């Protein structure tokens, strides 16, 4: 489903989800009333923010909702398994890696498609105008993140030898500082870091969905398979079926609300307020996120791209079918279109 099709149906979906969420809650009160989310600074958390600000989570039976920020996906994943948070909303690579190492997590849904938000940016004086000129650049990225996959896909598409690329492992804030200091020539990261670099005079070499190279500037080239997912521990889902349904119904309601163009100004203001980002920054990057919860072939393809990367890089063996650790029932009950059903059951 493309963005236009999804937004055309957003109002109907939101209304249906409101009714379904009430029906789901009628099945039984959540087993827990206190819940904590892993949180971050980018707009992917818009559904969570709206659900909290409008009191929908409290309406669903969660009387205490807290958020905890983490510097990396691994730390958030550990907190999820330890029960310190109940919902994790990472990019799709970390949970796939965790599943393949035996850590019991389950995907409950797609929060948003964020391929366009992955940006490879470079210093203007690096003069990177062609793919092969990347060999001369030190490229900052967070190793093991979705950015690693995007760089690998870029190399594959343009026929580059990935082993020759000079990757410097560093977290996003350090990437921007290092770029400004001339310690690296480029970095590949998600928002708002790419936007901040471009605002400071950097150039866009490639986004997750389009080329910035001279040879094919503006051409649609999808190097990113990044999705933001709703992830929970298997133990939480098994022990809290009502809470799981209520949580997903509320988040899906939030997705429908933030996707409705009529709510854009309100949502952007809430996101800026809660994340501490400048409103102009949120406005500039907002359209790079598509809050489409549909379970379709696109979901499977993006998850498989990540799995294939992990397998080809030797980080996992015997890649699993993404649907084997995907639980679609709560999302389906909340009104999400499920074209490919998950195979995991509590």
Segment roles from a protein language model:
Residues 5-26:
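N-terminal export signals
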Residues 27-174, 185-191, 204-208:
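Short, glycine-/small- and polar/acidic-enriched structural segments
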Residues 55, 78, 82, 96, ...:
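Solvent-exposed, polar/charged alpha-helical surfaces in well-ordered, non-transmembrane soluble domains
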Residues 59-63, 210-223, 291-298:
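Short, solvent-exposed loop/beta-turn-alpha elements that line the ligand-binding surface or hinge
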Residues 61, 84, 89, 99, ...:
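Sec/Tat-exported extracytoplasmic proteins
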Residues 93, 176, 185-271:
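Pocket-lining segment of extracytoplasmic ligand-binding domains
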Residues 237-317:
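Secondary-structure end/capping motifs
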Residues 308-346:
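Conserved C-terminal helix/tail region of periplasmic/extracytoplasmic solute-binding proteins
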């Amino acid at each position: 489903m493309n963005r236009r099709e999804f937004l055309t149906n957003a109002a109907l979906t939101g209304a249906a989800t409101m009714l379904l969420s009430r029906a789901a809650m009628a099945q039984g009160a959540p087993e827990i009333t206190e819940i904590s989310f892993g949180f971050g600074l980018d707009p992917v958390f818009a559904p969570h923010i709206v659900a909290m600000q409008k009191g929908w989570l409290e309406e669903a039976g969660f009387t205490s909702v807290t958020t905890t920020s983490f510097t990396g996906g691994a730390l958030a994943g550990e907190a999820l398994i330890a029960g310190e948070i109940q919902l994790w909303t990472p990019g799709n690579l970390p949970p796939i890696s965790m599943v393949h190492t035996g850590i019991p997590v389950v995907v409950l849904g797609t929060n948003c498609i964020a391929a366009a938000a992955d940006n490879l940016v470079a210093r203007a004086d690096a003069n990177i105008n062609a793919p092969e000129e990347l060999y001369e650049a030190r490229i900052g990225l967070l190793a093991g993140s979705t950015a690693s996959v995007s760089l690998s896909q870029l190399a594959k598409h343009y026929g580059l030898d990935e082993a020759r690329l000079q990757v410097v492992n560093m977290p996003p804030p350090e990437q921007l500082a290092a770029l400004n200091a001339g310690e690296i020539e480029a970095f590949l990261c998600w928002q708002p870091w790419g936007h901040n670099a471009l605002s400071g005079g950097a150039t866009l070499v490639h986004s997750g969905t389009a080329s910035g190279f001279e040879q094919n500037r503006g051409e649609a080239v999808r190097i990113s398979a990044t999705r933001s997912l709703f992830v929970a521990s298997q133990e939480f889902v098994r022990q809290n079926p009502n809470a799981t349904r209520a949580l997903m119904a509320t988040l899906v309601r939030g997705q429908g609300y933030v996707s409705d163009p009529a709510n854009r100004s309100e949502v952007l203001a809430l996101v800026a307020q809660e994340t501490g980002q400048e409103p102009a920054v949120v406005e500039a990057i907002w359209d790079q996120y598509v809050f489409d919860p549909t379970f379709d072939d696109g979901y499977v393809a993006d998850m498989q791209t990540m799995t294939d990367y992990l397998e080809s890089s030797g980080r996992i063996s015997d890649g699993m079918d993404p649907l084997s650790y995907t639980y679609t029932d709560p999302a389906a009950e909340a009104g999400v279109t499920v074209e490919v059903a998950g195979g995991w059951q509590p």
